[in-house]
Amino acid sequence: MVKKHRETKETDISVELEIYGSGKCEIDTGVGFFDHMLNALCKHSLMDIKLVCKGDLFIDDHHSVEDCGIVLGSAIKESIYPLSCVERYGNSIVVMDEAAVECAIDLSNRPYLVYESSLNEKIGTFDSELIREFFQALAMNAGITLHLIRLRGDNSHHIAEATFKAFAVAFRRAISKNDRMGTPSTKGVL
């Protein structure tokens, strides 16, 4: 179990993370749609996540969503590195009705994000551009290479949810135990 806390003038965030959990989730960011997405991530990754964020929502959701990515990414990094006896790579295609999203992950300790998606400006009251901001912060702070590609879809809610679920499934596969793997790199270290 990894515990992280980060406090700034914009947000106060606490997270408890168990990457080899059962999908138990306690999320309270004050941003309803984002909570819904994090619950989906938790359920389909099988990570146990307790995350509480108090942010400056009177301004907008940006600081809360991005900073949750920073803190969750930092907790993931502490949980997975140094990498040993796991698959390292994971991928998935997740569909939700008409929407399909592909995710590929490399637990490389080389942070990078490729994000190709088009969504309506808003999903309810949620600024859809914050989905990219969240995954950018998560990838940079977790030290993972992350590709998220919208393959098809019209409904922005479906596309967003498929994105979080695709990440969850690919991450679960990347951290799958493989005792024969040792350090999964020809360099001998990640």
From Swiss-Prot:
GO molecular function, one term: imidazoleglycerol-phosphate dehydratase activity
Pfam families in alphabetical order: IGPD (PF00475)
Catalytic activity: D-erythro-1-(imidazol-4-yl)glycerol 3-phosphate = 3-(imidazol-4-yl)-2-oxopropyl phosphate + H2O
EC number(s) given by UniProt: 4.2.1.19
A GO cellular component annotation in the UniProt record: cytoplasm
Pathway assigned in UniProt: Amino-acid biosynthesis; L-histidine biosynthesis; L-histidine from 5-phospho-alpha-D-ribose 1-diphosphate: step 6/9
Subcellular location: Cytoplasm
CDD domains assigned to the protein according to its UniProt record, in alphabetical order: IGPD
Keyword terms of this UniProt record: Amino-acid biosynthesis, Cytoplasm, Histidine biosynthesis, Lyase
InterPro entries named among the record's database cross-references: IGPD_sf, ImidazoleglycerolP_deHydtase, ImidazoleglycerP_deHydtase_CS, Ribosomal_Su5_D2-typ_SF
Record keyword Cytoplasm present: yes
Domain of life: Bacteria
GO BP annotation list: L-histidine biosynthetic process
PANTHER family xref list: IMIDAZOLEGLYCEROL-PHOSPHATE DEHYDRATASE (PTHR23133:SF2), IMIDAZOLEGLYCEROL-PHOSPHATE DEHYDRATASE HIS7 (PTHR23133)
HAMAP family from the UniProt entry: HisB (MF_00076)
Family according to the record: Belongs to the imidazoleglycerol-phosphate dehydratase family.
Protein name: Imidazoleglycerol-phosphate dehydratase
Lineage: Bacteria, Pseudomonadati, Campylobacterota, Epsilonproteobacteria, Campylobacterales
Originating gene: hisB
